[in-house]
Regions:
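Charged interaction scaffolds used for protein-protein
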Residues: 1-9, 31-45, 70-137
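Short, surface-exposed, low-complexity cationic segments
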Residues: 16-39
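Short, structured coil/loop segments at alpha-helix boundaries
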Residues: 18, 50-51, 117
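Short, hydrophobic/amphipathic alpha-helical patches that form generic packing surfaces
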Residues: 53-65, 108-112
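Extended alpha-helical interaction segments
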Residues: 1-24
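Compact, well-ordered interaction domains used in eukaryotic information-processing assemblies
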Residues: 44-48, 52
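Poly-acidic low-complexity segments
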Residues: 13-15, 51, 102
């Protein structure tokens, strides 16, 4: 998956280690469940709000494989993660505010990438099932 921000193309690849350390799959599944009920406008709004908070973490994880020179951090210890996350947040702010980027389209593209990527698809489906079970209880 390739995204263009600040006039630069970034090749997003969700590697296993970066995704596992980022811990966003279960959060993303819960957001999907919140947004899936067409009669729950509050859940949809909360889901959108949570997605705004989560997107920088997802993008940062996806940047680790091909752009660690610019956005890399120690995946084992988390050293420098907050600094790199801040850079991604600034990049997303610029994308939305200055470039008139479509955040919802970006969210859709990233979610589709996760849903169609082999190991991520399976993880996402498992976490979605867990989230649905928790909501039904």
């Amino acid at each position: 998956m390739t995204i263009t921000m600040n006039g630069k193309e970034y090749n997003i690849k969700f590697g296993n280690k970066a995704v596992a350390r980022a811990g966003f799959i279960s959060k993303l599944a819960k957001i999907g469940v919140m947004q899936s009920d067409p009669d729950d406008s509050v859940g949809a709004i909360e889901g959108m709000e949570q997605m705004y908070l989560l997107m920088p973490q997802i993008i940062l994880a996806g940047l680790q494989a091909n752009h660690s020179d610019e956005f890399g951090y120690n995946l084992t210890t988390g050293k420098d993660r907050d600094e790199q996350l801040g850079k991604v947040e600034d990049m997303l702010d610029h994308f939305v505010d200055e470039e008139n980027g479509d955040f919802l389209k970006l969210q859709e593209d990233v979610t589709n990438e996760i849903l169609h990527n082999g190991f991520l698809k399976r993880l996402f489906e498992e976490e979605t099932a867990k989230a649905q079970d928790q909501i039904q209880k």
